[in-house]
C-alpha cells in the first residue's frame, strides 16, 4: 500500500464497482471543507469527477501502470489513461460554451475567455464543482446518496456508464446543457454530443453530470439559477432512477465531502443562498428555479422517461393481470366454500327438523298406546317426509353464480350427485336405526309401568324392618330397658297429668331387670330418680314401690362390696357389720373369687368415690364399689334440705291439682 500521498501525485483509485481508475490527488483549497478523517480528495481523469477515498484504495501510478493501465470499455476510462499521460495537470473541462453560460443575457464569450474564467473559478469549483464532481465520481466509481443531494437536481445515472464515449459527452456537454439558450446546447454538442446523443435512450448519465458541471461554472459566472432550474427539473423526473444505480459503499463519504465543499466556499453572495437551501435541498430549491427552465429540458428527457414509463407500464400491466387472476380465483374459491357451507347447514337443519318430527310422532304414539301397526304406519309416514325433503336439496339456487364466474359446471354436478348419494345413505341408515327403536319404545313404556310399582314397594319395606330390629335389640339389652323405664317414670309423674298406674308398672319392670354394676354406673340418673320418688307424697303406693326397688338395688351392691366397703349411712351400718362378720360366706350365690374380681373392677371408680375417703375406706384398705357412692350420695341427699324442698314443692303442686279437680 502507498505510504504518504501528496497533492499532485498520480495514482490508480479503486472504488466499489469500478476498475482501478487513473486519478490525481487534489489539494484542499483555502476555505474549502476539509475531507473527513483518513480520506484524501481525488480527481479522476476522463470523467473529471472528484471523491474522497481512503489511502488503502490508492495505488501509485508508476508502479502499477502495467497492472491497472490496460484499456477498458468503461466510459471515460480510456480517456483517463490518455489524459494522465498527456495532460496530468488537467482540471475540469470548460469548453468555450462556458463563457456563453456566463453571459447568457448579453454576449457569447470566446474560448480563451472561458478558460480564464475557469482558472478564476477554480476555488468555486472546489466548492460547487466538488459537489457535482464528487457526486459524479460517486455515480461512476462509487455512486451513493451524495449524488442525491445535488442528485435531486440530476436525472438517472444508471445507464450513462454503459460506454466510455458517454463520459466524454458528460465532460464536454456539462457546461452546455444547463445554459438556457439552444446555442449553448449546440456548443456542448461540438465537444462530444456525437457520442452522447445515441445514448439518450438509456437516460444517459451525461445529461445529469453535465447539469452538475454546468452548475459549477454558472456558480462562478453567476448563472446558478439557470443551472439549478435544469438540474431541479431533471431531478424531479428521475429521483427514483438516481437511487437505483448507485452502490452505497462510498456514497456517504463522497456525499459528506461534496456537501462540505459546496457549503464551505460561499464568499460570493449567490453561494450563501445555496448554503441554506442545500440543507433543505428538496424543500426550497425546486419550487423557485424549475419553473423558468422547465420547457427546454423536457424534450431532452422525454425519450428516457418514455422508455422507463413503457417498461414500468408493461410490468404494471403484467402484475395487474396476475393480480386480477388471483383475485378471481380467490373469489371463486370463497364462493364455492360458502355454497358448500350453506348446503351443509341446510342439510343439518333438515335433519334436525326430521328428528324433531320423529320424536313428536313417537311421543304421540306412546301416549295413545298405538299398536305395532300404528307404529309401522308412522314409520311409513316418517319415511315419506325425508323423501319429500330429499327432493328439495338438489336444486340450490346459489351455485348458479359460481357457474357464471367459473367454468366448472361439471364439478358442481358431481358435487350435487355425491351430496344426493350421501343424503340417501344417511337417511337409510337413520331409518334402519329408528325402526327397531320405535318397536322397542312401546315395550319400554310397558316395562316402565311395571317397574314403577316395584320401585314403590322397596320404599315401604325399609319402614317395617327397623321396628322388628328395635324390638329384637330391646329384648336382650338391660341398658335399653333401664333407659326406657326411666323415661316412662318421668313422663308418668308429670305435674300436669300424673299417671300413677303407669309409674307402678315401670317400677315393677325395673325391679325385674337384671342389672350389673357397669350398667348402673352408666345410668346413675335412675338411682337419683328412685331417691326422689321415695318421697312422692301424692301417692303412697309410688313411695312404697320406689323404696322397695331402691333397697333391692342397694342390697345387690352391698352384697358385692361387703368385704371392702362399709356404708356410711346410719341405717345400713348394722347390716354392714353383720355382713363383715360373714366375710367367708358368699352373698347372693357369689364366691370369694367373684368378689375379688368385682372389687378389682370397682377399684376404677368415679371421682365421686373420692369425696369422702375416710368413710368409704374399709378396714382392709380396699376402695368401695363405684356404685356405692351413688347410694351414699343418695343417702346424703336425703338429709339435705334441698332434697326436702324439692319434695315439698312436688307435694304442693299435687295438692293444688287435687283442689282444682275437686
UniProtKB/Swiss-Prot annotation:
PROSITE patterns linked: PWWP (PS50812)
One cellular component (GO) term of this entry: cytoplasm
Ranges annotated as biased composition (Basic and acidic residues): 234-246, 314-366, 411-456, 464-484, 562-574, 645-655
Ranges of compositional bias, category Low complexity: 172-186, 220-233, 247-259
Ranges of biased composition (kind: Pro residues): 265-274, 393-410
Sequence segments annotated as region (Disordered): 84-484, 561-662
One Gene Ontology biological process: DNA recombination
Pfam families: LEDGF (PF11467), PWWP (PF00855)
Subcellular location(s) of the protein: Nucleus; Cytoplasm
Compositional bias of kind Basic residues: 143-161, 206-219, 277-296
UniProt domain PWWP: residue ranges: 7-64
Biased composition (Polar residues): 84-101
GO molecular function, one term: histone H3K9me2/3 reader activity
Keywords for this protein: Coiled coil, Cytoplasm, DNA damage, DNA recombination, DNA repair, Myogenesis, Nucleus
Residue runs in coiled coils: 320-370
Family statement: Belongs to the HDGF family.
Record function comment: May act as a regulator of myogenesis. Promotes the repair of DNA double-strand breaks (DSBs) through the homologous recombination pathway by facilitating the recruitment of the DNA endonuclease RBBP8 to the DSBs.
Protein name: Hepatoma-derived growth factor-related protein 2
Amino acid at each position: 500500500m502507498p505510504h504518504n500521498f501528496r497533492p499532485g501525485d498520480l495514482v490508480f483509485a479503486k472504488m466499489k464497482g469500478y476498475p482501478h481508475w487513473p486519478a490525481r490527488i487534489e489539494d484542499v483549497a483555502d476555505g474549502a471543507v476539509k475531507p473527513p478523517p483518513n480520506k484524501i480528495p481525488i480527481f479522476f481523469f476522463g470523467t473529471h469527477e472528484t471523491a474522497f477515498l481512503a489511502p488503502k484504495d490508492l495505488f501509485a501510478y508508476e508502479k502499477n501502470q502495467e497492472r491497472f493501465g490496460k484499456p477498458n470499455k468503461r466510459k471515460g476510462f480510456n480517456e483517463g489513461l490518455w489524459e494522465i499521460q498527456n495532460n496530468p495537470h488537467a482540471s475540469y473541462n470548460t469548453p468555450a460554451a462556458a463563457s456563453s453560460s456566463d453571459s447568457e443575457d448579453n454576449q457569447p464569450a470566446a474560448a480563451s475567455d472561458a478558460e480564464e474564467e475557469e482558472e478564476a473559478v477554480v476555488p468555486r469549483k472546489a466548492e460547487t464543482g466538488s459537489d457535482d464532481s464528487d457526486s459524479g465520481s460517486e455515480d461512476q466509481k462509487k455512486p451513493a446518496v451524495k449524488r442525491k443531494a445535488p442528485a435531486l437536481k440530476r436525472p438517472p445515472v444508471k445507464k450513462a456508464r454503459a460506454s466510455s464515449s458517454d463520459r466524454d459527452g458528460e465532460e464536454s456537454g456539462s457546461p452546455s446543457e444547463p445554459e438556457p439558450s439552444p446555442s449553448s446546447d449546440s456548443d456542448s454538442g461540438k465537444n462530444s454530443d456525437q457520442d452522447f446523443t445515441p445514448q439518450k435512450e438509456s437516460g444517459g448519465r451525461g445529461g445529469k453530470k453535465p447539469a452538475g458541471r454546468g452548475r459549477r461554472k454558472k456558480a462562478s459566472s453567476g448563472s446558478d439559477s439557470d443551472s439549478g432550474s435544469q438540474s431541479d427539473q431533471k431531478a424531479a423526473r428521475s429521483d427514483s432512477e438516481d437511487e437505483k444505480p448507485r452502490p452505497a459503499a462510498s456514497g456517504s463519504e463522497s456525499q459528506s465531502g461534496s456537501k462540505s465543499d459546496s457549503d464551505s466556499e460561499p464568499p460570493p453572495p449567490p453561494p450563501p443562498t445555496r448554503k441554506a437551501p442545500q440543507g433543505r435541498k428538496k424543500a426550497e430549491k425546486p419550487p423557485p428555479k424549475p419553473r423558468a427552465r422547465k420547457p427546454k429540458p423536457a424534450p431532452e428527457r422525454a425519450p428516457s422517461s418514455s422508455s422507463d414509463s413503457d417498461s414500468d407500464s408493461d410490468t404494471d400491466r403484467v402484475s395487474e393481470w396476475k393480480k386480477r387472476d388471483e383475485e378471481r380465483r380467490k373469489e371463486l374459491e370463497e364462493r364455492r366454500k360458502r355454497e358448500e357451507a350453506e348446503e351443509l347447514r341446510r342439510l343439518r337443519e333438515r335433519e334436525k327438523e326430521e328428528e324433531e318430527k320423529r320424536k313428536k310422532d313417537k311421543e304421540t304414539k306412546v301416549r295413545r298406546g298405538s299398536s305395532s301397526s300404528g307404529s309401522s304406519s308412522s314409520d311409513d309416514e316418517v319415511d315419506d317426509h325425508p323423501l319429500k325433503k330429499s327432493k328439495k336439496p338438489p336444486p340450490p339456487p346459489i351455485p348458479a353464480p359460481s357457474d357464471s364466474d367459473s367454468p366448472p359446471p361439471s364439478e358442481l354436478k358431481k358435487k350435487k350427485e355425491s351430496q344426493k348419494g350421501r343424503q340417501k345413505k344417511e337417511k337409510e341408515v337413520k331409518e334402519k336405526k329408528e325402526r327397531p327403536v320405535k318397536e322397542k319404545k312401546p315395550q319400554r313404556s310397558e316395562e316402565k309401568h311395571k317397574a314403577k310399582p316395584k320401585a314403590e314397594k322397596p320404599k315401604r319395606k325399609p319402614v317395617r324392618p327397623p321396628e322388628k330390629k328395635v324390638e329384637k335389640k330391646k329384648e336382650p339389652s338391660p341398658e335399653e330397658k333401664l333407659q326406657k323405664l326411666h323415661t316412662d317414670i318421668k313422663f308418668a309423674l308429670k305435674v300436669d297429668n300424673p299417671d300413677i298406674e303407669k309409674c307402678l308398672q315401670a317400677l315393677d319392670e325395673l325391679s325385674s331387670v337384671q342389672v350389673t354394676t357397669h350398667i348402673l354406673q352408666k345410668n346413675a340418673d335412675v338411682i337419683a330418680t328412685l331417691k326422689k320418688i321415695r318421697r312422692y307424697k301424692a301417692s303412697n303406693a309410688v313411695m312404697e314401690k320406689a323404696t322397695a326397688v331402691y333397697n333391692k338395688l342397694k342390697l345387690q351392691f352391698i352384697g358385692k362390696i361387703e368385704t371392702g366397703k362399709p356404708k356410711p349411712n346410719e341405717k345400713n351400718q348394722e347390716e354392714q357389720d353383720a355382713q363383715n362378720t360373714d366375710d367367708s360366706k358368699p352373698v347372693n350365690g357369689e364366691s370369694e373369687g367373684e368378689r375379688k374380681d368385682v372389687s378389682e373392677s370397682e377399684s376404677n371408680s368415679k371421682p365421686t368415690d373420692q369425696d369422702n375417703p375416710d368413710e368409704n375406706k374399709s378396714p382392709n384398705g380396699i376402695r368401695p364399689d363405684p356404685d356405692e357412692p351413688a347410694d351414699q350420695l343418695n343417702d346424703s341427699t336425703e338429709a339435705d334440705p334441698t332434697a326436702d324442698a324439692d319434695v315439698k314443692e312436688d307435694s304442693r303442686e299435687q295438692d293444688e291439682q287435687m283442689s282444682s279437680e275437686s
